Amino acid sequence: MIKEINIKIKNFEGPLDLLLHLVSQYEMDIFEVPLVPVIEQYLIYIQTMKELELELAGEYMLMASQLMLIKSRRLLPTVTETFIEDTEQLEYDLLAQIDEYRKYKMLSEDLDELHQERSHYYSKSKTEIITDETVLLQDKTALDLFLAFSKILELQRQQIEDDNTTIAAEKFTIADKIFELNQRFTEQKICKFTDLFSDKTKKDELVTTFMALLELIKNQQVSFSQGELFGEIILERKEISE
């Protein structure tokens, strides 16, 4: 179990914010989005938060229970027409909540933009405004990085369930993994995110490697980008300016 981790991943503003992020990846009308895959991604995200021992608000667990209800009703055999109508209503109500939150968030962002424009004429400096925008952009991209790791961790869980082999426990430290990653990026300046985990089969090693990567990103030693929707995340070692 990993303790004393100083890295904090900026959380979503709430469960609806997370769901909106997941739904937005499909780039289609909210009410046309396939809901079951979204629910599965949400539940994987919640499980990964627990695995990384990151703080998780109770509202996320409440939403998780509601989503599990919808998913279970989807998987159950059709009983009556009323059952189908009730399930569809639950799904519609959820998507309506997400859509309403989307409108609220757009309005909030518009108001924030107006506030920043007005700040040009008052006390806030141009440098401060640019810094704020950079942080917001980085946080949004970091969420995609975290979700990508969630998928890797979920795949590893499935492999453990299918494998009855007992493996002796090993200890992995963030410091060791930082050293290992630095060596890798010295030899190979650019690599795929998934390549960092392709040869790792133990959950503790996966988690420790991810935490080490976050430390390198936090210290601006490594940058990352995603060229297209659902595309591969690319990691690149940053040159240290003297």
Curated annotation (Swiss-Prot):
| Pfam families for the chain | SMC_ScpA (PF02616)
Transmembrane domains' residue ranges: none
Subcellular localization, as worded in the UniProt entry: Cytoplasm
Q: Which UniProt keywords apply?
A: Cell cycle, Cell division, Chromosome partition, Cytoplasm
Q: Which PANTHER family does this chain map to?
A: SEGREGATION AND CONDENSATION PROTEIN A
Functional note: Participates in chromosomal partition during cell division. May act via the formation of a condensin-like complex containing Smc and ScpB that pull DNA away from mid-cell into both cell halves.
Tell me its family.
Belongs to the ScpA family.
- Subunit description: Component of a cohesin-like complex composed of ScpA, ScpB and the Smc homodimer, in which ScpA and ScpB bind to the head domain of Smc. The presence of the three proteins is required for the association of the complex with DNA.
| Name by which UniProt lists this protein | Segregation and condensation protein A
Organism name: Lactococcus lactis subsp. cremoris (strain SK11)
